[in-house]
Amino acid sequence: MHNIIQRPMAINGQVVIRPMMYLALSYDHRLIDGKEAVTFLVTIKNLLEDPSRLLLDI
């Protein structure tokens, strides 16, 4: 994970500044299929965006 920094984003046709962080995943394609790796990364992204999901296990 990288630092959280303020970056411009287009939201509803407006440019707004939002906190953003890059998240990367490395995996060995001989052991793990790309679909499972992406599914895992999306799950981590969703939990970071809404930690209450992790605490409430939903």
UniProtKB/Swiss-Prot annotation:
Going by the record, the broad EC class of this enzyme is: transferase
What are the BP-aspect GO terms? Answer: L-lysine catabolic process to acetyl-CoA via saccharopine; tricarboxylic acid cycle
Q: Which domain of life does this protein belong to?
A: Bacteria
Q: Which cofactor does it need?
A: (R)-lipoate
- One Gene Ontology cellular component: cytosol
What SUPFAM superfamilies is this protein classified in? CoA-dependent acyltransferases
Give an example GO molecular function.
dihydrolipoyllysine-residue succinyltransferase activity
Cofactor binding mode and count: Binds 1 lipoyl cofactor covalently.
- Please state what the protein is called: Dihydrolipoyllysine-residue succinyltransferase component of 2-oxoglutarate dehydrogenase complex
What species is given as this protein's source? Pseudomonas putida
Q: Quick one: which gene encodes this?
A: sucB
